[in-house]
Amino acid sequence: MQKIKEGYRRRHDYIIPKFISFQSGYLDFSFYQVSLKNVKYLDLSSYYQLHAPRRFRKIVEYLNLSYGQLLTLGTLPKYVMSLDLSSYNQLFTPGRLPIRVSLDLSSYNQLFTPGRLPDTVDYLKLSSYNQLFTPGTLPNHMVYLNLSSYNQPLTPGTLPNKVKYLVLSSYNQLLTPGTLPNNVKYVDLSSYNKLLTPETLPNKVKYLVLSSYDQLLTPGTLPNNVKCVDLSSYDKLLTPGTLPNNVKYVDLSSYNKLLTPRTLPNNVECLVLSSYNQLLTPGILPNYVKYLDISSYNQLLTPGTLSNNVEYLDLSSYNQVLAPKTIPNNVKCLDCPSYKQSLISETFPNRVGDLELSDHPKHVNDNWEIIKPQKNISENKVYYTTKHKNAKIIDVLNICKCSLKLYGYVKDRNNEFNIYFEYIDKAIPLSRLLEKLNKKEQFIVATEIIKSIKSIHEMGIIHFDIKCQNILILYDENEKMLPTDFIKIIGFDHSTLDSEVNSNIIGVTETHMAPEIKLKNGKLGYKSDIWSLGCTLIEIVGGNLKLLDINGIPLIPDHLSNLFKNTIQHCLQINPNARFNANELYNYVIKDSIMEPIEPIYLPNQCTNLPLFNEVIVPSGFFGIKYLELQAYNQPIDSIFIFNGVEYLILQSFNHPLGPGILPESIKYLKLPSFNHPLKEGSIPRSVIHLVFNKFNQFSLDEINLILPKFLDFGDAFDIEKYGILIPEDSILTLRTGFTFNQPINQRYIPSSVTDLQLYNYNLKILPHSIPRSIIMLTLGSNFTHFESLSNLPSSIINLTFGFKNNFKIAELKKYIPSHITSININGKIVNFKKSSPLNTFNQSTDNILNNNEHFKEDWEIISTLGSGNFGKVFKARKINGIINGSKVSLCAIKKIEKKDKLKIKLSTEVEILNKLKDNEHSMKYYGYGYDEDDNLFIYTEYIEGSTSISDLIKKKPNNRFEEEEIKSLMIKIVKALSKIHESGVIHRDIKSDHIILAQDKNNETIVKFIDFGLSKQIEKNSKYYSFVGTDSHMAPEVKLQNGKAGSKSDIFCIGCTMIEMAGLNLCHSERDDKGIPSIPTHLSNSFKNIIQNCLKFDTNARHSVESLIITLSNIQIEGDSVFEKYLSPNLKKLELKTNEPILLGSIGNEINYLSLPIYNQMITPGALPPSVQYLLFNKLNQYLECDSIPESVKYLDLGNEFDIEKNGINLSNESILVLRCGFNFTQPVSQRLLPYSVTDLQLYNYNINLKRNSIPTLVTSLTLGSNFTNIESLSFLPENVNSLAIGIKDEDEKLTKEIEKIIQTKKSITSFKINGIQRN
């Protein structure tokens, strides 16, 4: 800890990550002088004290805390969503826990009484609790409940009805109908052994654990929907109909009563009868069973007894003669260790890939003898190494088919080992074959690798360096992969025996290294190989091991099958105990469709893909996830299904109706490929920016009030000719559809707000006025041939994309392209009709300075250093003889790249880019390159005397900044120059003031030139760039995240940063928000602030394009900035502003503390309202509020009558708000999660429905309710702190008044009470 403090004092820009784990000691937050606003997951699992906890009250969402002292009010962060207090066992009092939290109290065993737990808790783990529960003790919203030690009587109503996942593994009290919640789907009653009657178990149960149950079961006792049942102790007679027809997994491990046909349901896929030894005849076992365990069976099997669908078969005790075809043909894995009968070739099917038999009397294999080493082994090739960790390992490997034979080893005179191995002529490292394997071969190789690692582990060996380079593939003489045993594992340099493993493993491949090896936490073992195996499988299928999620786990490629994805996912678990071992992994691959009940687990990962998930949903399982993909899920969902925090949601197979409020308001990207139900108002969250359908094809008049996102992709199915006229206006900016048009498009199909229209299957004529004038970018079909109709395009279009498949030459199309179109993409290529296409590859002629590409120092005079670029310095130099490339040009700019830096870049990068741009007037002319005698690289470009960089000009300016008019004038030239660079097919990727040069052309006009193309990239069709390159202070978010979205818009982000530079702000030391977006100088006009803001958008689709930025800069008016300009007076304190124009950044003075916006109803951009406002009043506002829309300074907030707090107020979490007024007409009981925790005066003057327990924040002292409040009994749920209450009733009902007064008398804390505005005693 002291080192952290000292490091912080040395460097004030110390960065706190989003995930913090402290492993021991005492945590003192007092040394942090920075905000912990980025910390989302905080692991304090070994800390035993807390000091200054308010330092992280607001920002931590996931807290793991080993804390045994009494919790006091305010100790825990207010907005924690998942809280691990697994060691806590002190008494809770109301208000000590956060208002909405997933809670782990594994050690807690103090008495709970009603009201001690927040009503919003939906995940509760009380695995040590064994005190009697009474009805109302547990919150009604509970979905996951773990009471694994509980064994007190339960009565109907004790458990919350919404519970879906229930663990009562110690419970053995009599259950009666209605005791278990009706909605429960997973029930663990491992210890239960009381008689069950029909209707005791709820009908919705799908997973049922009754592992101790041995009472007689009768038809109807088990629910009809059960899919998985554990009856591992059951040994009473089963009759037909006892087990439900839908069951797929049955564990009858102890059962040994005679089975008759139809006793077992035909749909069973996994059947465990490990004690069964009664005669089996054809028709007894289910026809669809795939996994069959009859490991005690030793009666004669005949052909037809076992189902043809069996793939995994355990016959561990079987030793009767096996006739041909007795074992089904589909069996892949067969366990027969007791079998000692004679074998013929037809005994086992050809598909059996894993066969375990006993030692056969005729089995002899002399090939496994160790041959003593000789001094010369001429007939074998020899591998030589200086490393040899343990000879015993190599001795053991001589009996393992998946490793090379060892011939021996000797020490030479230098005491180094010479190890002699088998050499196989037809063996190729897997790393050299990756691009040649098809999908089927990839899976076959993966299965064989798993099998080989299983063999190594069974011999007690841990490899520690599994990767493609250490795996050999064996081929036959025809260069075809051997049918079996074609894998050889090599590279045992780091290996150890299991009995000798230690935590100090060094030198293994970092990209494949398991977390426990990096952490040296003592958890090394066989599971470390499983992690490396997962990384190797990603290698095999073409994945990139450098692409990691927030926890450092490699991302699994999307194109894989569900089985392949799940196999890798079972390998790449942070916790070694959660990984499969090699045997489990091999069995999983062989019997991929076996269903097992999986307990919902805590997932802090921000990126989660559950390809096969289609069962019980537990919200706590999704806490912390920002990216959630469920490929197979197709069940109805409700509002608690997905945790509020998910930003990217993909429901690949989902096709059920969506109601208002079902999906959380945090979602920004929503993909519903299979969805085809009517959309209702509020069914698509307002936070969604990007919405993708594929099969959606309906719209009605009821949907015209929908607010749809800015980017909408309808896919191929949506009939835009039929429904297009009903699409809501004014919200969609980008519209994408693959509909195949039957007639020319009509502009009434397209909303007037759309600026980017993508009709990628439109190949018909374009009629006059058929495309709206709002369109700036247009994409047409891949076989568009009506070129003459392009003249009908509106003049607003500047970007056009289309394709064609006929014999037209692109050059012939020039006459059809309207002059207002500046960017053209044809068949995936950017076309420039104004100039001949630049050279495409570096291999073409480059007019180099020297034919042999050599650099001689004596030929050059270095005049001065111009600067340092990426990977090299740049010098101003003179050629001694005054001739460069045959011309009389003496001055030159030379970039020197050291040999060591040359390894970081490819020569073909900067040289090829410069060569490609040699005819582009906005880059320095390229002369050539050369190497000196030390192999340093020199790149020669034009030098223009008198030229200067933007950064040098900034230094010469007063206060080191340009005036706005100067920035505007220069930026128009800079962006136009950038458009020419992009037209040449190049993205710069490192634009900043240092790399922009101003020079004079022949006409003495200022011309912009870009330099330092060392990090540039050529634009290619369908390219996704993942490289982490550029200057950090100017780097776009998508480049830092390496998410494949980097492209030409990344240069626009750099332009925005450069404008900030020119305005006088040092980006290296500027403040940034949570997404890394730099702050904008406050002295700029609102118009300029908004231009920069639109360059710095996190979402690349929302960012300016080159074309739109040129237009916006050209139209900007520096003076008379906006209607708000007159309100910038620093002396103005109180302001009533009657306007409905969007409020721009900085448009309202920072001294205003009272702000009234009576008619305002626009989105409030975070930061638009001044940070000085304390009193904020609205009347017409009804827009979604983002996290920072309301300044932290606001103490009094009046939301007026229009604001729908149920839909738009989820982020209303300011701790500063003390008084909140809202006239919203609630349709359902208010929830604490909608109200600021800090409110003391709450005025809900149109609230006339019932109150629920814990629905009002505990700090509220003054409460105002509606004018027709009749739910009198619910007033008993008021918090204890309320001392002032005002309500209204109609018609002065005396009876109602007396009832109210009677309840108020029980609330001793209430000292002031009003009905209809009249004070009551």
Curated annotation (Swiss-Prot):
Q: Which UniProt keywords apply?
A: ATP-binding, Kinase, Magnesium, Metal-binding, Nucleotide-binding, Repeat, Serine/threonine-protein kinase, Transferase
Protein kinase domain location is: 295-595, 860-1128
What catalytic activity does the UniProt entry give for this protein? L-seryl-[protein] + ATP = O-phospho-L-seryl-[protein] + ADP + H(+); L-threonyl-[protein] + ATP = O-phospho-L-threonyl-[protein] + ADP + H(+)
What's the Enzyme Commission number for this chain?
2.7.11.1
Matching entries from Pfam families are given as:
FNIP, Pkinase
Residues making up the signal peptide according to the UniProt record: none
Needed cofactors: Mg(2+)
Active site positions: 465 (proton acceptor), 990 (proton acceptor)
Q: Which PROSITE patterns match?
A: PROTEIN_KINASE_ATP (PS00107), PROTEIN_KINASE_DOM (PS50011), PROTEIN_KINASE_ST (PS00108)
Provide the residue intervals of the FNIP repeats.
108-149, 150-191, 192-233, 255-296, 654-696, 741-783, 1160-1202, 1224-1268
Q: List the disulfide bonds.
A: none
So where does ATP get bound?
A: 301-309, 325, 866-874, 895
User: What InterPro entries does this protein's entry cite?
Assistant: FNIP, Kinase-like_dom_sf, LRR_dom_sf, Prot_kinase_dom, Protein_kinase_ATP_BS, Ser/Thr_kinase_AS, STK_FNIP-Repeat, WD40_repeat_dom_sf
Question: What protein family is recorded?
Answer: Belongs to the protein kinase superfamily. STE Ser/Thr protein kinase family.
Name of protein: Probable serine/threonine-protein kinase fnkE
Q: In which organism is this protein found?
A: Dictyostelium discoideum (Social amoeba)
Starting at the broadest rank, the lineage of the source organism is: Eukaryota, Amoebozoa, Evosea, Eumycetozoa, Dictyostelia
